Structure formats: C-alpha cells, structure tokens
Amino acid sequence: MAGVGIDDIAIYFPKLYFDMKDFAEFRGADFGKLNKGLGLTAMAIPDAHEDTATMGANACARLIDRNQLDPRKIGRIYLGTESALDGAKPTATYIMDMLEQRYDDTYGKECFRNCDVVDLTFACIGAVDAMHNTLDWVARGGDEQDRIGIVVFAD
C-alpha cells in the first residue's frame, strides 16, 4: 500500500468580518464566553456573491496553482459540508465547474473530465469522512498510480 497523507492545505476566508461583541449583543449571548472561553474576536462571513461553492473553488484554485497541479490528473474532489446549495446536485460539482472555467484555456475544456465529485453532508464529520475516504482511495492506487485527490471543507 502506498504511503499517503496531506501534502498541502489551502485556506480561503471571506473578507468580511463580524465583530463578536456586536454578535453577542445582537444574539443576547455572553461575550466573555465567546471571547475568553472560545478565543473569538471576529467571525468571517460570506459576501453577497460568496457561498460554499465559491469559497471551496477559491481554496482549490490556490492549492492547484501553488502546487502546479495538472487538473487532468486530479481524480477526485470530495466536499465535506453542512451547507449544500442544491437539494439534488452536489455542491462539489459547482466547485468543479468553476475550476474548469478557470483552467480551460491552459488545460482544455473538460480538464476535470475524469474527476469524481461528491458531497459528504453530516455536520463536521462529513469533512472528516471525505478526508478518510480520499486517503483510502489514494492508498488503494498503489505506488504505480500517482493519484491526486482534493478534499474541501466548506461552510
């Protein structure tokens, strides 16, 4: 079995922030518990044009660019989320569509043709399951296959 692991992590945070003092006041929550107990001072919130898919696509693009990955060699993009956009279609398909638009001039249309995309939706465990599943998939490829999988955690 091939040695597998996490090669890199890319993070995308929205640019808008909500002050936790304001949040606590608005929600009638104890700011001390949020600030001292959880260490929170602000919370990132998506802009009007941002959602789970755009944030996931931004993080994926950073990862692909930084590691000079060929999208044609990426075999899967698995998304762990609590915030699905569509009741029937996986949000990961929207991420893949945005990535195809970004890379089609360089790698050709449908450069993610052989990429499997799935959402795993179950609170925080969905992302952990996506990671374990992808690590197992890479390991099962053996040393002769150079499998590349991307796991996205987005909410």
Regions found by a protein language model. Name each.
Residues 1-78, 96-104:
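Conserved "HGTGT" condensation-loop signature of ketosynthase/thiolase-family condensing enzymes
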Residues 10, 121-124, 153-155:
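Short, flexible loop/turn elements at secondary-structure junctions
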Residues 12, 82-84, 155:
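Short glycine-rich anion-binding loops that position phosphate/pyrophosphate groups of nucleotides
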Residues 33-51, 84-147:
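Conserved catalytic cysteine-centered active-site region
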Residues 75-83, 87:
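Long, acidic, intrinsically disordered low-complexity segments
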Residues 80, 146-155:
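Short beta-strand segments
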